[in-house]
């Protein structure tokens, strides 16, 4: 009887662990989708920033600082 009770307990725990594992997997998949979407948005923003800097003549690193008064 004790062995049967222990087996039932283990089966119950495994079922809960399977459910938890599935839920965690779904969260990881959704997070990966969010990361990929954010990476695309960041790349688009970088491109827009580079385009705007090109239009306004962006700051050149070799440009001398203005004289102080």
Swiss-Prot record:
Pfam families recorded: SlyX
InterPro entries, A to Z: SlyX
Family (UniProt): Belongs to the SlyX family.
Name of this protein: Protein SlyX homolog
Source organism: Pseudomonas paraeruginosa (strain DSM 24068 / PA7) (Pseudomonas aeruginosa (strain PA7))
Name of the gene: slyX
